A protein has these predicted regions:
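Metallocarboxypeptidase
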Residues: 163-307
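Conserved beta-strand elements of the Class I
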Residues: 54-56, 272
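Acidic/histidine-rich, surface-exposed loop or edge segments in extracytoplasmic proteins
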Residues: 1-6, 57, 180-181
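Surface-exposed patches in mature extracellular/periplasmic domains of secreted proteins
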Residues: 31-35, 85-94, 247-252
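Short beta-strand-to-loop junctions in surface cap/lid or active-site-entrance loops
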Residues: 44-52, 60
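Short glycine- and acidic-rich boundary segments immediately preceding or forming the N-terminal edge
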Residues: 1-43
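Di-metal (Zn2+ and/or Mg2+/Mn2+) metal-binding site signature of metallo-dependent hydrolases
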Residues: 63-69
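Active-site/substrate-binding loop(s) of hydrolase catalytic cores
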Residues: 52, 67, 74-76, 80-221, ...
Length: 307
């Protein structure tokens, strides 16, 4: 029986319960508390594998993209089950893969925002009303479904020191010059608890590659400015071929201050933003099975790293 629930909204409490259940069912899966969010929700890691290659996968930087969290959790569960049973995952021998790579994950970077969009926050309570007040100055953005930011109104994927000033200029020109549901870069790079902790964790792990999971568009973004990363395009092309997703350059208005941008700039290694599914966020859970099927080969290819 599956531990990861893919037919109900993935709240922060359900995510934490799932991580605990996975580490109990599969003792070779490990977890640690990375930090607490602005409103005190735990942000946890989930780690599987024992190999020398290190990769880091993140999901739910954006609140209304929470469907990416069960993608990561389901992958860890399927991988763990295959290790325990001496089987394979996606055609790869699980034991061999686990001995060659360690997969670090942060399945829910933005638990406060996710709980707003999934309905886990109660109207009348401070976190909900904080967001509701910020949203009133953006009447054209549906509330709470259009919410991407944390509950301080900062877009966590515009917080990284890789073209942050360019991102600020672009987003301010679009009217996102104050805290709100989306696209506000904050007062300074990495000034939010969530982004500071993830940047520190990334530096601590020093991974060979990162995947940042978002929705939507069935697209893989792979580059930052003119930074040349050996093998990045080739690996991206392989992931695109196996998933059916398109490998594309990031549109200019979204090309700065993202997590993968920062990783590419400072580490000089492959970093990818994966935009899963199609439609209007938050994507319905009816898309989950297709999203997971498309992304399993991406997750495995990134872990193996061979072109």
């Amino acid at each position: 029986m599956s531990i990861v629930k893919t037919d109900v909204p993935m709240t922060s409490a359900l995510c934490n319960d799932t991580i605990l259940a996975l580490t109990q069912a599969y003792p070779f899966c490990r977890s640690e508390l990375l930090t607490q969010s602005a409103f005190g929700r735990p942000i946890q890691t989930l780690v599987i594998g024992e190999g020398p290659r290190r990769v880091l996968y993140t999901a739910a930087h954006h609140a209304n993209e929470w469907i990416t969290t069960p993608v990561i959790l389901k992958f860890v569960e399927e991988f763990a089950e295959a290790i325990q049973n001496g089987g394979s995952v996606g055609g790869m021998d699980a034991g061999d893969l686990a001995s060659s790579v360690t997969i670090y994950t942060v399945p829910m970077v933005n638990p406060d925002g996710v709980d707003l969009v999934t309905g886990a926050l109660q109207p009348g309570k401070i976190p909900y009303e904080t967001a509701a007040e910020l949203s009133r100055s953006f009447p054209n953005i549906p509330f709470p479904d259009g919410w991407k930011a944390n509950l301080l109104g900062v877009d966590l994927n515009l917080q990284y020191p890789a073209g942050w000033l360019q991102a600020r200029e672009i987003k301010y020109s679009q009217g996102y010059d104050r805290p709100g549901p989306r696209d506000y870069v904050g007062r300074a790079p990495l000034n939010q608890l969530e982004t500071r902790a993830l940047a520190d964790y990334t530096e601590e792990i020093d991974p060979a590659l990162v995947l940042a999971y978002h929705t939507q568009g069935k697209v893989i973004y792979w580059q930052f400015e003119d930074v040349f990363v050996p093998g990045a395009r080739e690996l991206g092309e392989k992931m695109a071929q196996l998933s059916g997703y398109a490998l594309e350059d990031t549109p200019y208005e979204s090309a700065f201050a993202g997590y993968k941008d920062w990783f590419i700039k400072y580490f000089g290694r492959p970093g990818y933003t994966i935009e899963v599914g199609e439609g209007i966020n938050p994507l319905p859970l009816s898309q989950f099975d297709e999203i997971y099927r498309d992304n399993l080969p991406i997750l495995l290819t990134a872990a193996a790293g061979n072109v």
